[in-house]
Regions:
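Acidic anion/phosphate-binding donor-loop and adjacent secondary structure
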Residues: 67-70, 164, 174-198, 209, ...
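Short His-centered aromatic/hydrophobic patch
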Residues: 91-99, 117-118
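Glycosyltransferase donor-sugar binding loop
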Residues: 42-48, 181, 204, 229-244
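Donor nucleotide-sugar binding/catalytic pocket of nucleotide-sugar-dependent glycosyltransferases
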Residues: 142, 146-188
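Short hydrophobic beta-strand element within catalytic cores of glycosyltransferases
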Residues: 298-301
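A conserved mid-protein helix/loop that constitutes part of the nucleotide-sugar donor-binding site
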Residues: 23-29, 203, 208-222
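Aromatic "clamp/platform" in nucleotide-sugar-dependent glycosyltransferases that forms part
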Residues: 281
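Membrane-proximal helix-turn-helix segments that form the acceptor-binding/catalytic region
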Residues: 32-34, 76-79, 132-152, 248
């Protein structure tokens, strides 16, 4: 009897995502700081399965076809799980949130839920498919989200306004900039004693069109200085409508002036470069920009919602959208960065995993005492 009573008193929350990488990459460092909850994971089986099992209290498999915009089988599978588990849920990404809302429809046992929208993504892109999907969802989106989600966490106020205008969401909203970084894990770049002979430029990103991959290729071909080397790190995102085509991937691989690295260990390898570019056309809060600023790279980024929030940082230049020649000019004129200690102090105070985890934990506690 005592054991059963104890089990009922355990506060449990399930981190839910349609991609195992999301629960591993930026959420793994949050778990150890959240002491008031038993954190479980639910996601598809993937290459990070073993790491996820070592981090979370328990792991449930959720098979989903990422190539489908709406996987009906995955929705039904999630619905069955929701019927049989007593847990709060924290959904990560808008796509996962939509699937959760559909699975939760008309269920009697309402599991309280938080949604972190870390990017408006495909749904709010300009493609004809996205416009059609928005048109189809518009009549139902308000009911779906207000019925299933208690709290939505955004990463900047601009995108929050866009989403609320579309969804008419009236429950609680919070703005928590960034997903947090575990700053102690990063190798810091040493300040050079002299101007380096070779200057290394890198773009780290999923290989998506809206991440500016093709713009980056244009820059590579426009810069003519022999002492500048260009690198691209990241992988394709199968199932994402913005995933670059096989043909364009071949162009990337065949570009003689570009070194394609695939996946890298950002925490230990980012310090090997001098300049970090962020060329996304939209971004809620650029994690790679935050990481680059912490490590000590000079950063050049498009001026969008997810980068402008970091305008007070040193060694950061923001450029208006589509001004590729200004990127070229800035790269060619780059000399050396100034002291980076201010950036590290700001990040350690406001943007670490520990800081974000404490904000999450506060939200979870408020859910527990709400009706």
């Amino acid at each position: 009897m005592l054991t059963n009573l104890r089990l009922k008193m355990v506060l449990m929350i399930t981190y839910l995502s349609h991609w195992d990488w999301i629960l591993y990459k930026s959420r793994k460092d949050l778990v150890k700081y959240i002491k008031s909850e038993e954190i479980h994971a639910m996601c598809p089986n993937g290459i990070h399965r073993e790491e996820i099992e070592s981090i979370y209290k328990g792991v449930s498999s959720w098979e989903i076809n990422r190539n489908k915009i709406l996987d009906i089988k995955a929705i039904l599978s999630l619905r069955s799980h929701l019927k049989n588990v007593d847990s709060k849920f924290h959904c990560f990404t808008l796509k996962t949130g939509i699937l959760f809302c559909l699975a939760n429809l008309f269920l009697k046992n309402k599991n309280k839920a938080v949604l972190s929208i870390t990017g408006l993504g495909f749904l709010f892109s300009r493609s004809s498919k996205a416009k059609l999907l928005r048109y189809l969802l518009k009549p139902f989106i308000s009911y779906l989200f207000n019925n299933a989600i208690n709290v939505i966490i955004f990463q900047n106020t601009s995108d929050k306004d866009i989403f609320l205008n579309f969804s008419n969401f009236t429950n609680t909203t919070e703005v928590i900039p960034s997903s947090g970084i575990e700053s102690a894990n990063f190798k810091i770049k040493d300040l050079p004693s002299s101007n380096p002979a070779k200057k290394k430029v890198i773009l780290v990103s999923r290989l998506l069109y809206d991440k500016g991959i093709m713009d980056y290729l244009s820059i590579v071909n426009k810069v003519n200085m022999v002492n500048i080397e260009f690198y691209l790190a990241g992988e394709r995102d199968e199932g994402n409508p913005q995933n670059i085509s096989d043909k364009d991937m071949e162009i990337v691989l065949n570009e003689e002036k570009l070194n394609y690295l695939g996946k890298i260990d950002i925490e230990t390898q980012l310090s090997e470069f001098d300049i970090s570019l962020v060329m996304s056309s939209h971004e809620w809060f650029s994690r790679i920009l935050l990481e680059s600023l912490y490590v000590g790279l000079y950063c050049i980024a498009y001026k969008i919602q997810g980068t402008e929030v970091m305008r007070e940082f040193n060694n950061l230049e923001l450029i208006e959208l589509n001004q590729i020649d200004k990127f070229v000019d800035s790269i060619e004129k780059y000399n050396e960065i100034i002291d980076n200690s201010k950036n590290r102090q700001l990040i350690d105070e406001f943007f670490t995993s520990k800081v974000v985890a404490s904000q999450f934990e506060k939200i979870y506690k408020e859910l527990d005492v709400s009706n």
